[in-house]
Amino acid sequence: MADTGLLTELAAEADAFVHSVGLLLDRESGLGGVNFITSGSRSVPAEGATYDTVMRDSAAALAAAAQSGATGGAERPLVYVSAAEAAWCESEGGQKLEAALPEFLGRYLSAKREAEALLQASSGLRVVLARPSLMYDWSKLDVLPLLPIVNPASALGERYGGGLGLLSKMLRVHVVGAAVVAALEAPEARGAKPICPHLPASPSISLHLTTSPCISRGARRALARRA
């Protein structure tokens, strides 16, 4: 999203916005060269591409473009596809689990949270923060082996609680996509409120919304300056 002029031009013609740009392995992780294995688009991050530039700064650019095209009428919706694990910082168990992650995954979640906070502070937009966990389809062989492990563990967590309750079920990409569309079309979808559209032949999905209360003080100050 480096071409802000083009982005602003396209935003002026849009009724709604979805930000789903992301990467699991950035350049600073030292694993960027194998990001194509986890990427749905088989992408390899460019030199200098970090979680902050790809997931946070691009969200800021989209919000700015959307705001510049506002006509003073109804707020246009913007859905940001975040991550369920961004909520880990809101519980003691989640904080412990996050502390055990590799450093680069901690930076991944921090970038998601900072993007969420930045978007929530944007005026003139109805911001929805969609928080699915791992997504899959039958063509992505890298993530499919996790399916028979994660989903049963998540189901046990829902029933009995404990640490397994922090695991969110893996969802098929089209289920998340349909839920995002439903959030765009639901004028009441905003802020700290779950949206649970029931999709035909699909499990229900909760898109948990938050104001990202657990980003660092330094990040809060930086975001305030941006706003």
For each predicted feature, which ranges?
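NAD(P)H-binding glycine-rich loop region in Rossmannoid oxidoreductase-like domains
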Residues: 1-72
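Short, small-residue-rich loop/turn micro-motifs
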Residues: 22-23, 82-85
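Oxidoreductase cofactor-interface core, primarily capturing Rossmann-like NAD(P)-dependent enzymes
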Residues: 76, 85-199, 217-220, 224-227
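Intrinsic disorder
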Residues: 202-206, 212, 216
